Every structure is written in C-alpha cells, then in structure tokens.
Amino acid sequence: RILVCQMGGCSGREVRELKIAATERLINKYEVNLSAFMELNYNWATVASSANLASWFRHEEREVRSVAAHNQHETTTRHQPGGTGMVCRYEFLQYARKPSNDFRGLGRWCSWPIYCNPTHSTRVVVAYRTGSGKSKGLRTIYQQQIRYMQLHNITGTPQQLFDKDLLHQCKLWRKSGERIILLLDANEHVLTGKFNRQISRTGLDLEEFTHKCWGAHQPYTHINGSIPIDGGYKSPEIEVLNVCMLPFLDSPGDHRAFIIDISTRSLLGEFRYKVCRPISRRLITSQQRSVDEYNRIVNEQFDRHRIVIRLDAVDKMTRYCGFPAPNFLRAMIIKLYRQMTEIRIHAEKKCRKILRPDSDYSPTVQM
C-alpha cells in the first residue's frame, strides 16, 4: 500500500511537525508500507546525514528508511523549493534496494527499486514537474532550473527538459526489464496535458491509472485548482487493485493525498510471503561490549554538550530562585533533560551493529 502526498513545503519546523503528524496518522490508519512525497522544499545539504527524511518520523516503533532528492547545485539556505522523497517501512524494508535520484542533480525525482528476485524488479518513482508559469522570485523551482539550463547551454523550458529526461530514464528502466510505478505532480491535467501526450509519442508503455477512480466528474487535486494535476502512471504488468483519493481535510498538504493498493503478485512475484523482521535491541546488558560502547558514546556526548556543567548551573539557579521556579528556568531544565534523553537514544542506536545478510528461506515443511 502506497501513500502519495504533495507536502507543499516542510522547511519550517512548526509546519513540518504538523504535516508529519498528519502523515503518520494516515500511515497508521491505513497501514501504509511506502510513502511518497513531492515538494518537500528542503535543502538536505544544509543538515547532517543523520537528519534525513526518516528522522522526521519519530513515532515509528520499527526501523524506517528513506530517500530524498533536492537541487544539489544551490545550497544557500535550508528552504529550497522543490524536491521529492520516499519513506519505506515494515515488511517493505527487506525488498527495498539501492535508491537513485535525478541524474542532473535537480531533485526533480527519486526512485526506489523493490524486488525479492532480481529478475522481477519494480521501480517506484516519485516526481515533481514544475508549472508552466514563470514564477516571480530568484529561488523558485522554475528559476532554479532556468539557471541550470543557462549554465549548461540547454535550450527549451524546464517542463520540456523534465519530460525529455524523465521519459528517457523510464525507457532505460524498461529496457533493463524493470516494472514502473510513476507517481507525479504534473502541474497540468494528467490525461490531456503535454506530459501524457509525450508518453504516447515516445512509445513508452505507461498508462495513467488514477483517473479510473474519478467517477462521473473529474476532481481537482489542488485546493485552489479546477483540474486533476496529481496522478500515477504504471507499466502494463502492474496490477492496481484500489485507488482512494482522500479529502483535503485529511491531506497533509494543499493537494489531495491518495492511497494505492498494488498486488504483491505484480510487485514482487508469485508466492511471496509477508515477512516482517522482529524488533531487535542493540543495547543488551548481558553483552559487556555493547554496554561499554553505550557508556562511551554517552560520556562523549555529555562532554561535547557540557551536560554536567549545565546541570550544576541549573541546580545552583534552582536553589537561588526557590520554588516555584520562573518560566525561563523551567524551560531550561526541560530542554536540558530532553537533550539528555536524545543522547541516550542516539547511543542505544549506535552501541552495536546488527548485520542482516540475505539468506534463503527454509524449504516448505511437509506435514
């Protein structure tokens, strides 16, 4: 089950937390395996590699992995319009292989091949296609791509370059035998727009499938729009069982989110069982090596962030101010203890490495 969300920007912390909380509610309610996001508006080059897209989902009990793409040629601020990403969780993790991004480094799309058998591979692609309007401002997606095209002497418009590059990449994937699920914010009508016509002209065997759930009247997928600009394309081998468009009220961004059910038979192949790895703790007190490594990381982080010195300072200020403590002191204490908790969680995740080599399943047990 795949959840598709047009986030409309997540660079601000307050807005991001609200949108991610809404996304987590949808993930838990509908038991989503893979989440695809467009227009994250986040420059991942300005943060540490550990602060990835998966780190935004703090309430997940089990491991999650992510892939994200942004414009790698401009790294001025954390807010950067555009970008795409995906988050994989639960039983999908064991089938998700090495992801890839836009080969021009513009963050227009990212993809994740999913397979159990390499001869039966399905590639999930999430893409964001800029609109045809020449948006004002120097940091818009349109202006970013125009600057790239001028720098490399590429003629045409950003939309033409996107259509040419993505369809060429899809052809290469199809030629290598991969099945394709393309999830797209086209910024135009997904059936009558230029991108869909380009698919027909190039002879690529992709068809739009979300329109089959529209009913008698086509919906508008942007809150201020009048036509469906968000959709999905698939190769003929993919079996789409259900498509559900959510209302704007339940969607995290300003576009309607939608959920797609795809058969395991077409995605992974015949006779594949639903296997989910159990949760394994890295910190085990009976293993002295993991305990020593945990203590080493905690002490190192405590020294780096001067935790003990700050605790002594807070203790002295508490004695001086008395009870009840002023608001600024309460906020300082809460922040300090929250940081101590984060350090312990970080140390628990890093104290022992768990290897998960690929291994065959045992033969079927004969009763």
Predicted regions located by residue number:
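Surface polyanion/phosphate-binding segment centered on an Asp-His-Pro turn
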Residues: I114-Q150, E237-M367
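Metal-dependent phosphoester-hydrolase catalytic domains
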Residues: N33, V87, E91-R108, L172-I180, ...
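Well-ordered, non-membrane alpha-helical segments in soluble/globular domains
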Residues: R16-T23, S50, Q144, N153-H168, ...
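Short, basic/hydrophobic alpha-helical segments
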Residues: L18-E31, C116-P118, T157-I181
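Structured beta-strand-rich core segments of catalytic domains in phosphoester-bond hydrolases
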Residues: N41-S132, L246-P252
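Conserved, non-catalytic sequence blocks in retroelement Pol enzymes and Pol-derived host proteins
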Residues: R13-R16, E74-T77, G156, N196, ...
